């Protein structure tokens, strides 16, 4: 054998030595055969006789026809299928009829029945004869080539080796009908998929490093004989990319090992070696979770085919469903495709479940399949009657593969799924697991109570290091006008927020109050903020996208903000870019029935303009963003923040308050690798997200540290079954307490209200509860039960208790509404209206709609609704007054609080309490009416005199110096701290005759200024 000259000879010797160690045997004497036919026919014939011992009669003829078919087949996809599954051959035997057999080319079960050879510098026929450094054969079929370069050479690098392999694919395309992948061995040890390039296309194929199970770089681990067979059988496929071009799928090391760990969990469970039937694959964006799911589906289907395996690929968004469906349709060489189906309706799901259950009871029915299904098909309401008669499926050979497993996993859909498929195996995939009190990805898919948080982890730093995602650069842009907001600006903000309020001009809040109440998310919705952000984007977009070599995304606070961004970006980009047109920017948002008028008008506008409905437009613009020139900028709110894979996207402008997993998911849209793309750019237009990002990364990295994991385990995770047992015990205790307070059984209460739907009856019961001396204990028990139920996530046993849970929440909502009814006087509720939409008060929406009305008490004194009304009035008044600081309000508040205690303790007669309550409410109503006509100085004087009389026992009629100073203060636009110091001095003088003791007078003066005057004027 001719050897390469020094120094390359050392590289080649190293390769030969390692191949020999792995059980590959050097091939000699077949150069001519390989040169003409690409395969080594004598070896193949001999091996096929050995591995096809299932064929009896006509074996030689079957084998001859199979070899001829293999040699003459022009399509690499078909040849890969032959290599994976064998070749089906049919012989026509005249009167005997047709005889069929599948001729195996490789024995995947019995590795030693195959022969593994390597050849050094073997020539292959092509337009130019090519000579790979090494060719690896299995049973005479060329499967792998190795191209070697000197490790320490400026000229001979791995890039040169890759270019050489690409040239081979063009010059000897038929060889690559058989060769499945190539190894690059030089300054880097890499592997790439290979396939013919007869069209001589300019291809971009990313080379990968291989790491062994310990995550140590080791290309020889990939070339182990068992690894090669496993990879070919279960992990290599042909497909088409989104542009319709042929491509070849080959596993990356983290995909392979994650799938193998998940498969080990599956086999141990099905072979009764372990009770564990779930697992979490925690892999960051760009690691290829879609194909991890498809690999595992194929592996499970292939290995358990004789047990009628069932696979449910579950997603929770239409975009993901479409993506998976398209990817599976494009996939070739996957055996599971023979029985793949997308479940389009709840009725179809019922049919599939019924077929599976019937196959359990009837051995003559074979039911296997791979199903793509939306989580929302497991709808308790739509499946209620079905489930009552159907029950559960006992079959264990059911695999649930759940993408984006951090979402939709603690509610009714997951609970119902787990109830029906009670013995199924569930493997969850996510880049951002969630751990909150009511939802924990770790608890749903792992065994944290046993120290297992995941089967496999591949997070951000590993992804960037391996080149599967790019580094992210953050640019923080802090709006200047928020640095030192003035009182006038506060006034303007209030006018915008409450423009439709009748009393908007009377809403006066201090700088401190507005800072506490108005959140960043509210400010990010303001038109002025969006306008300024759009101006900034227009000024930087060309630089940030490299003159639109790449594309951009704008993430807005809400859907209305998206439309405003479109308006202002069009305006400012038109000024900056000469050839700009409005198709460069498009809004991709969700539209709902009865949308706000601005969104509805925009919807009508674009549907008319483009002649398509908004769903079609969203789909078109999303696809065009990836594959076409326009749009160049997508404007989004929630859509596309997760699961959107667009390597062309480089820059994301974030004008939304994001944190935790959603921030990580959103930022990951920018760092997908693309040709000549060095990094992803995040422009933080809020000024604070970078700290949120760092915190989220730190939180996730906690789960890598074994010591911290142990601490987390001890402090945060409790076995779900124990939580459930606690829930059941405490539910029984709660029911006994309910009966003690209300006088009826809890279950009877539910039955009666379901029949009557009587809100008055409900209010009576709520009032009894509120006015009971056991109320605090009752309410604590109620909240604890709700929290325990939510804490068990998608635990299957929950399903039978959902109605109980709903009624617990209704009671809680009823108590909250009766104790804290909404008041038009508190404008901050409007600021938080988006939050209020999510409160679950649908069932009894009209229960607590009472306003303060003393006359109502007079009219109802002798009616049985009195308990309800007293409870309403007391708690409404207390809630309304509790944040009021003026002495008049405080005095009324304290008196009503005394009446509440007297009413509950029964130390005063009902009539006395009611009469006193009427007096308080009348006084409150009178002062509220009077307050509307008072200036700030008049309001301050009235409250000071009230305080001095009722608290300090000073019967003083006038405070002349103080009053004059306050009136002057009222005309000032800017109030300084020194102004309040001046008031203290004048008040100290005014009180000279009323409070003789100097120190006490100073304290009273200071207290009045701090607690009465300042809150009114600031």
Swiss-Prot record:
GO terms for molecular function: ATP binding; DNA binding; helicase activity; type I site-specific deoxyribonuclease activity. Gene3D superfamilies: 3.90.1570.50, P-loop containing nucleotide triphosphate hydrolases. It catalyses: Endonucleolytic cleavage of DNA to give random double-stranded fragments with terminal 5'-phosphates, ATP is simultaneously hydrolyzed. Pfam families: HSDR_N, SWI2_SNF2, T1R_D3-like. It is an enzyme of class 3 (hydrolase). GO terms for biological process: DNA restriction-modification system. Its EC number is 3.1.21.3. It comes from the Archaea. Keywords: ATP-binding, DNA-binding, Endonuclease, Helicase, Hydrolase, Nuclease, Nucleotide-binding, Restriction system. The keyword Transferase does not apply. Belongs to the HsdR family. The type I restriction/modification system is composed of three polypeptides R, M and S. The restriction (R) subunit of a type I restriction enzyme that recognizes 5'-GAYN(5)GTAA-3' and cleaves a random distance away. The R subunit is required for both endonuclease and ATPase activities but not for modification. After locating a non-methylated recognition site, the enzyme complex serves as a molecular motor that translocates DNA in an ATP-dependent manner until a collision occurs that triggers cleavage. Type I restriction and modification enzymes are complex, multifunctional systems which require ATP, S-adenosyl methionine and magnesium as cofactors and, in addition to their endonucleolytic and methylase activities, are potent DNA-dependent ATPases. This is Putative type I restriction enzyme MjaVIIIP endonuclease subunit. It comes from Methanocaldococcus jannaschii (strain ATCC 43067 / DSM 2661 / JAL-1 / JCM 10045 / NBRC 100440) (Methanococcus jannaschii).
């Amino acid at each position: 054998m001719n050897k390469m000259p020094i120094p390359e000879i050392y590289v080649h010797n190293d390769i030969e030595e390692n191949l020999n160690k792995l059980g590959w045997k050097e091939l000699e004497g077949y150069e001519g055969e390989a040169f003409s036919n690409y395969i080594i026919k004598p070896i193949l014939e001999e091996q096929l006789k050995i591995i096809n011992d299932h064929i009896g009669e006509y074996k030689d003829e079957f084998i001859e026809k199979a070899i001829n078919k293999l040699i003459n087949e022009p399509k690499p996809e078909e040849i890969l299928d032959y290599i994976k599954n064998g070749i089906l051959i049919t012989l026509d035997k005249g009167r005997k009829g047709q005889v069929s057999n599948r001729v195996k080319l490789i024995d995947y079960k019995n590795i030693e029945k195959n022969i593994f050879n390597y050849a050094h510098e073997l020539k292959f026929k092509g337009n130019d004869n090519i000579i790979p450094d090494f060719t690896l054969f299995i049973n005479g079929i060329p499967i792998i080539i190795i191209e070697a370069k000197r490790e320490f050479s400026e000229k001979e690098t791995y890039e040169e080796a890759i270019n050489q392999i690409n040239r081979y694919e063009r010059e000897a395309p038929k060889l690559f009908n058989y060769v499945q992948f190539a190894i690059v061995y030089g300054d880097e040890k890499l592997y790439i998929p290979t396939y013919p390039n007869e069209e001589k296309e300019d291809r971009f194929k990313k080379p990968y490093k291989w790491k062994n199970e310990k995550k140590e770089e080791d290309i020889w681990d990939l070339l182990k004989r068992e690894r090669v067979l496993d990879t070919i059988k279960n992990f290599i496929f042909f497909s088409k990319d989104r542009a319709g071009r042929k491509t070849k799928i080959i596993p990356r090391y983290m995909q392979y090992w994650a799938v193998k760990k998940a498969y080990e969990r599956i086999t141990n469970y099905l072979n009764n070696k372990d009770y564990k039937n779930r697992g979490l694959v925690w892999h960051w964006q760009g690691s290829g979770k879609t194909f991890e799911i498809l690999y595992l589906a194929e592996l499970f289907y292939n290995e358990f085919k004789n047990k009628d395996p069932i696979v449910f690929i579950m997603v929770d968004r239409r975009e993901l469903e479409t993506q998976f469906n398209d990817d599976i349709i494009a996939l070739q060489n996957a055996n599971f495709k023979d029985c793949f189906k997308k479940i389009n309706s709840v009725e179809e799901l019922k049919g599939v479940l019924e077929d599976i259950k019937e196959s359990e009871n009837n051995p003559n029915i074979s039911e296997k399949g791979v199903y793509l299904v939306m989580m929302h098909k497991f709808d308790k309401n739509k499946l209620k009657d079905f489930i009552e008669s159907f029950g559960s499926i006992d079959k264990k050979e059911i695999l649930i593969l759940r993408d984006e497993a951090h979402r939709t996993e603690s509610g009714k859909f997951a609970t119902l799924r787990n109830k029906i498929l009670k013995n199924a195996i569930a493997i969850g995939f996510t880049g951002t697991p969630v751990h909150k009190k009511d939802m924990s990805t770790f608890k749903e898919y792992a065994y944290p109570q046993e120290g297992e948080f995941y089967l496999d982890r591949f997070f951000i730093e590993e992804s960037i290091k391996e080149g599967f995602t790019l580094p992210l650069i953050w640019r923080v842009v802090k709006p200047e006008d928020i640095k030192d907001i003035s009182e006038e600006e506060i006034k303007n903000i209030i006018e915008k927020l409450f423009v439709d309020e009748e009393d908007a001009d009377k809403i006066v809040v201090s700088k401190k109050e507005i800072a506490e109440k108005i959140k960043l998310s509210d400010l990010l919705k303001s038109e002025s903020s969006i306008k300024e952000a759009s101006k900034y984007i227009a000024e930087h977009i060309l630089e940030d996208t490299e003159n639109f070599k790449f594309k951009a995304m704008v993430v807005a606070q809400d859907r209305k903000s998206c439309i405003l961004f479109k308006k202002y970006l069009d305006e400012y980009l038109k000024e900056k870019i000469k050839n700009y047109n409005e198709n460069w920017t498009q809004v991709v948002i969700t539209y709902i029935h009865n949308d706000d008028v601005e969104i509805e008008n925009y919807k009508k506008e674009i549907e008319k303009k483009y002649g398509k409905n908004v769903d079609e437009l969203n789909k078109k613009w999303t696809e065009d963003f990836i594959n076409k020139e326009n749009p160049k900028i997508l404007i989004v709110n929630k859509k596309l923040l997760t699961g959107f894979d667009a390597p062309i996207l480089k820059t994301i402008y974030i004008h939304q308050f994001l944190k935790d997993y959603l921030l990580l998911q959103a930022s990951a849209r920018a760092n997908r690798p693309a040709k000549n793309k060095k990094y992803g750019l995040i422009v933080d237009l809020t000024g604070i997200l970078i700290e949120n990002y760092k915190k989220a990364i730190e939180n996730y990295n906690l789960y890598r540290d074994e010591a911290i994991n142990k601490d987390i385990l001890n402090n945060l995770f409790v076995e779900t079954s124990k939580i459930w047992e606690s829930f059941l015990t405490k539910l029984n205790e709660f029911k006994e307490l309910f009966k003690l307070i209300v006088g009826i059984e809890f279950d009877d209460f539910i039955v009666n209200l379901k029949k009557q739907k009587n809100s008055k009856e409900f209010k009576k019961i709520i009032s009894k509860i509120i006015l009971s001396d056991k109320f605090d204990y009752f309410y604590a028990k109620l909240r604890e039960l709700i929290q325990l139920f939510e804490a068990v996530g998608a635990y299957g046993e929950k399903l039978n208790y959902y109605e109980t849970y709903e009624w617990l929440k209704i009671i809680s909502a009823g108590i909250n509404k009766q104790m804290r009814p909404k008041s038009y006087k508190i404008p901050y509720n409007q600021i938080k209206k988006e939050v209020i939409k999510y409160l679950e008060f649908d069932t009894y929406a009209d229960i607590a709609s009472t306003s303060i009305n003393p006359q109502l008490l007079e009219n109802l004194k002798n009616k049985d609704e009195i308990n309800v009304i007293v409870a309403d009035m007391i708690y409404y008044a207390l809630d309304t007054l509790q944040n009021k600081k003026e002495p008049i309000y405080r005095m009324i508040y304290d008196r009503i609080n005394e009446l509440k205690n007297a009413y509950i303790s029964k130390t005063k007669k009902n009539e006395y309490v009611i009469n006193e309550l009427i007096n308080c409410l009348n006084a409150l109503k009178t002062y509220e009416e009077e307050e509307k006509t008072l200036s700030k100085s008049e309001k301050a004087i009235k409250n000071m005199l009230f305080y001095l009389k009722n608290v300090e026992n000073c019967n003083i009629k006038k405070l002349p110096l103080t009053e004059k100073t306050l009136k002057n203060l009222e005309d000032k636009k800017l109030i300084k701290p020194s102004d309040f110091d001046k008031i203290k001095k004048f008040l100290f003088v005014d009180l000279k005759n009323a409070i003789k003791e100097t120190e006490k007078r100073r304290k009273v003066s200071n207290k009045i200024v701090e607690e009465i005057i300042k809150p009114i004027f600031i």
